[in-house]
């Protein structure tokens, strides 16, 4: 009897658990390893909460098989062989110009190439009807996808998934504000142009112009994406931007403690640090041995994958190795590309440096002997460093990296160093490194950032899981969607009111002004003649 009772209890517990388990699709195109890892963490957290998760990895770059993106969820892998090379070429092109300052036209051109290549891959994926039918049969309750390209949201709508969640994988960019018709704070946040801590008039103007131009560009590219979906699913298929504007929740994969403080939305939830393992301290003996070197500690150097050390100007790494020699009391760990033979060869004669194409970054960041992290300011690395309390020297190259580096500088736990310094002015970069190693305020502020993040009333996992379950359970939360999300740019910024008022004001000012000038001119030219006639 007791056995039967125990079995019934187990069955009831199983049924109760099953009721709250949802079928969820995580849409994860392979745009880079860091994005695969970020989406893998989202999938794992949903699975850890008891949900049935399908992690759909579309291999845009041929990197899915070698990237450990998820630990708990089995990956569903889709190949896109036709458009893969075109997408690779675009990213390779970014690597080749990473040391340049592209300006507005370069920014526009780069975005057009990226979105065109992505849209072509999206179109190729849409033609895989067998995969579509297989996914449609699973009757998903929820859908997650990033903001880099909004192809996934059109796909989710076609699958009939009504609860859709937008993941902003980097700080809230101006075009994501534009999705919701939420005015972006161009005066204070450097979205698409560099701005000093106290922005000048020119910096604010450039940021506004670049942001507005990019918003218009994305609207145009999204129109083309909608055309692709209507060709596939019929002319009555809604526009993809409209689908995105009605996403239930925007999950920001960033931390508000790290980012610029800026206006937010009722359906925007920060989940920075989700899935980051703060207990990752174990490392292989070879790396443990390296961490013991250096009388005053260890310095980590990694520029990510876009600023590839095998494709950027050789002088960059040669200059850095020259700086390494001037700090003999510190041991340097350098992550260099596996094809970068030049850096590895030049490092052989330097006693205080270790070069590898892979380093256990999370474990190194949590090691007590690490003094600073020199990074390109990619967000995954920033979150890991923030949670470890490690001060940063950032060398931003492109994308969200400048925005990230300025936020770190603003909050006092890092130094922003211009990418041209290692190329043209290594002495200035050396001065930045000396400042970091001799000024304890950076470490103090990094520890404060760490403590603020870890002591927040509600952690990233609780925010993420509870919000997701709450939304699906209640059939969406339209009550949180912004009222102005369907407005045009003209209505959203009240241009239809402001412009006519300005014209009226100008008219009221200009007409009297010209009358005054005309009267003055007339009097100066003819007044003396009229006066003479009167005297006569």
Curated annotation (Swiss-Prot):
It is an enzyme of class 2 (transferase). Glycans are attached at residues 52, 308. It holds the Pfam family UDPGT. Gene3D superfamilies: Glycogen Phosphorylase B (3.40.50.2000). The keyword Lipid biosynthesis does not apply. Its EC number is 2.4.1.17. It is a single-pass membrane protein. Residues 1-21 form the signal peptide. Keywords: Glycoprotein, Glycosyltransferase, Membrane, Signal, Transferase, Transmembrane, Transmembrane helix. The chain crosses the membrane at residues 497-517. One of its GO terms (cellular component) is membrane. It is found in: Membrane. It catalyses: glucuronate acceptor + UDP-alpha-D-glucuronate = acceptor beta-D-glucuronoside + UDP + H(+). GO terms for molecular function: glucuronosyltransferase activity; UDP-glycosyltransferase activity. SUPFAM superfamilies: UDP-Glycosyltransferase/glycogen phosphorylase (SSF53756). Belongs to the UDP-glycosyltransferase family. This is Putative UDP-glucuronosyltransferase ugt-47.
